[in-house]
């Protein structure tokens, strides 16, 4: 199926997606996000109802939401356009993968500066969300194994990410701030 052609939409809709998900662990939104099929996604607009919206928040067998798949398999403007549509339909940008990785962390790890800047500007985005290892996106960008990506750090700080020491959780930062205020 070509991403520029929505003539295959009827074929896509004929698939038994519940059976497909049971077999592959992916629903229609995971597949579309992975393949980068923006026109297919747009063609679904009138079909996404309250019954379908929970599919936008499901994890695939790999533990990713459709937004994680979009960030993993696409870059820059393509990822942004797909994610905009998925969010419009009801996907949640703050949902973490099954291994507790926020979508913002995926974009940081992939060095997708444009996507990171876009995510940081989204209403309600949690810039201080932590992954399984208690690292924020800012901490990931400033870690040595990511070559202390100064450009990424600057983007995150521009949009309000708070610099903190590696491994300190949000609560620890708040506690240390309270202690210094009371002294």
Swiss-Prot record:
It comes from the Viruses. Residues 163-183 are annotated as: Disordered. ANK repeats lie at residues 62-95, 99-129. Pfam families: Ank (PF00023). PROSITE patterns: ANK_REP_REGION (PS50297), ANK_REPEAT (PS50088). The keyword Repeat applies. Suppresses the host immune response through NF-kappa-B inactivation. Possesses ankyrin repeat domains required for NF-kappa-B binding but lacks the regulatory regions required for dissociation from NF-kappa-B and degradation. Therefore, prevents host NF-kappa-B release and subsequent activation. Belongs to the polydnaviridae I-Kappa-B like protein family. This is I-kappa-B like protein N2. It comes from Microplitis demolitor bracovirus (isolate Webb) (MdBV).
């Amino acid at each position: 199926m070509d991403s520029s052609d929505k003539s295959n939409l009827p074929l896509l809709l004929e698939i038994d997606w519940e059976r497909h998900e049971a077999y592959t662990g992916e629903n229609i939104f995971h597949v579309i996000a992975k393949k980068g099929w923006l026109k297919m996604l747009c063609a679904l607009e009138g079909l996404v109802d309250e019954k379908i919206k929970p599919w936008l928040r499901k994890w695939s067998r790999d533990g990713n939401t459709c937004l994680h798949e979009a960030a993993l398999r696409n870059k820059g403007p393509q990822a942004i356009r797909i994610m905009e549509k998925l969010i419009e339909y009801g996907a949640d940008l703050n949902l973490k993968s099954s291994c507790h990785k926020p979508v913002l962390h995926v974009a940081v790890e992939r060095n997708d500066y444009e996507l990171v800047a876009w995510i940081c500007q989204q209403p309600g985005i949690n810039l201080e969300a932590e992954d399984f290892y208690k690292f924020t996106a800012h901490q990931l960008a400033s870690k040595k194994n990511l070559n202390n990506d100064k450009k990424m750090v600057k983007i995150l700080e521009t949009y309000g990410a708070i610099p903190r020491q590696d491994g300190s959780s949000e609560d620890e930062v708040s506690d240390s701030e309270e202690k210094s205020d009371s002294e």
